[in-house]
Swiss-Prot record:
This is Alcohol acyl transferase 1 allele RGb. It is an enzyme of class 2 (transferase). The lineage of its organism: Eukaryota, Viridiplantae, Streptophyta, Embryophyta, Tracheophyta. The fruit of cv. Royal Gala exhibits a high ester accumulation, whereas the cv. Granny Smith contains low ester levels; this influences strongly the ripe apple fruit aroma. Its EC number is 2.3.1.-. Disulfide bonds: none annotated. PANTHER family: ACYL TRANSFERASE 4, OS05G0315700 PROTEIN. One of its GO terms (biological process) is fruit ripening, climacteric. It comes from Malus domestica (Apple).
């Protein structure tokens, strides 16, 4: 295995990729879901591809993706613009066609040599997604940065950084799919993009009709060691949920929940409990976990057209005092997670938009008592084919301060879910211990044993 301390990535000067044809010069408003403070962040994604001569016939991936990107921007031209801030901090897109920042690079390494180093939290992210000075702002900066790095094995890594106000994971996937289709020879995207951000404007007059614990002010009883501004001792580590881990967790929940809880629910309950224990949060402190819930599709009755690529989700929060969360069996946390997710519907999303306008676009709390989880396992990044087949890995490159992403990962023997966590170093060691204990094979079914002794 090579030493990654001497990994050499050679980059050409960044260039701005503009739409291949003339596009409208106009101003477009973001929705009131899009421009909330919580989404004014950059999200890194990494996608890794093997060489596949039988499919691409020695095509240059940089050239193919660059050309397809320019053609796709004809349809997604707002992404080639720049954000401006209007009255009351309302964000608008100046569709000026300035372009997306694009970097061509090469590295003296193979995918096989990289091994698990491509998985989140990717320790080589700064090499495969270089942060060019002045490019990472929210206002007046490129809305996307894409770096394509060719490897010595013939494979390549596409890493990108997205201004989250422009779209969510499903919107980004729609754009990447359009690029991929054009790289494979399509003349137009199979799904045409729809802007229509006014569909998620606040109502007139705005009215808050639901409880939104995710935006509530928190009285923090902790020692202040974990805040978003205290990054000096923060570390990241990923945790794997395979068949064995899920089997063990399911043995810890009451029978009436087994048939109704999803893998996402169970993982979220596990992480919430382990994290609260690891941080040694004051027993009387209120702790919360928010689940990002996609509003698309028929399930939540939010009427959005096919092709809508804006942010279309909310993150309802489950709330508990730390003491009962830590002391009760897993079923306690699981029921709270399920109830929080069940609150999501069209009325909830519209109430969020109204709250954001009435309260000046508040951000979620930055205290350690809050965790946000986002399920990217069904976003479809693993299906994006630029002409080299499906990626060996594709998804978020790391966790954010209080945000963990669930990503699909296939190890040597099975499909599972990988979850990067961000915690203070001392808490991370305790989290590791709690995780290992809670996912150990039990000698007997605890819940069934409790039921039998109570009869």
């Amino acid at each position: 295995m090579m030493s990654f301390s001497v990994l050499q990535v050679k980059r050409l000067q960044p260039e701005l990729i503009t739409p291949a044809k003339s596009t409208p010069q106009e101003t477009k408003f973001l929705s009131d879901i899009d421009d909330q403070e919580s989404l004014r962040v950059q999200i890194p994604i990494i996608m890794c591809y093997k060489d596949n001569p039988s499919l691409n016939k020695n095509r240059n991936p940089v050239k193919a993706i660059r050309e397809a990107l320019s053609r796709a921007l004809v349809y997604y031209y707002p992404l080639a613009g720049r954000l401006r801030e209007g009255p009351n901090r309302k964000l608008v897109v100046d569709c000026n066609g300035e372009g997306i920042l694009f970097v061509e690079a090469s590295a003296d390494v193979t995918l096989e040599q990289l091994g698990d180093k491509i998985l989140p939290p990717c320790p080589l992210l700064e090499e495969f997604l270089y942060n060019f000075p002045g490019s990472d702002g929210i206002i007046d900066c490129p809305l996307l940065l894409i770096q394509v790095t060719c490897l010595t094995c013939g494979g390549f890594i596409l890493a990108l950084r997205l201004n989250h106000t422009m779209c969510d994971a499903f919107g980004l996937l729609q754009f990447l799919t359009a690029i991929a289709e054009m790289a494979r020879g399509a003349h137009a995207p199979s799904i045409l993009p729809v802007w229509e951000r006014e569909l998620l404007f606040a109502r007139n007059p705005p009215r808050i009709t639901c409880a939104h614990h995710e935006y509530e002010d928190v009285i923090d009883h902790s020692d202040g060691s974990y805040t978003s501004s205290n990054q000096s001792n923060m570390v990241q580590r990923s945790f794997y949920f395979g068949a064995k881990e899920m089997r063990v967790l399911r043995k810890q929940i009451p029978r009436h929940l087994i048939s109704t809880c999803s893998t996402f629910d169970l993982i979220t309950a596990c992480l919430w409990k382990c994290r609260t224990l690891a941080l040694k949060i004051n027993p009387k402190q209120a702790v919360r976990v928010s689940c990002t819930v996609n509003a698309r599709g028929k399930h939540h009755n939010v009427r959005l057209p096919l092709g809508y690529y804006g942010n279309a989700f909310a993150f309802p929060a489950a709330v508990s005092k730390a003491e009962p969360l830590c002391k009760n069996p897993m079923g306690y946390a699981l029921e709270l997670v399920k109830k929080a997710k069940a609150t999501m519907n069209e009325e909830y999303l519209r109430s969020v938009a109204d709250l954001l306008v009435l309260r000046g676009r508040p951000q979620y709390s930055s205290t350690g008592s809050y965790l946000i989880v986002s399920d990217n396992t069904r976003a479809g990044f693993g299906d994006v084919n630029f002409g080299w087949g499906q990626p060996v890995f594709a998804g978020p490159a790391k966790a954010l301060d209080l945000v963990s992403f669930y990503v699909q990962h296939k190890n040597n023997t099975e499909d599972g879910i990988l979850v990067p966590m961000c915690l203070p170093s001392s808490a991370m060691e305790r989290f590791q211990q709690e995780f290992e204990m809670i996912t150990q094979e039990p000698k007997e079914d605890i819940c069934n044993n409790l039921r039998s002794t109570s009869q």
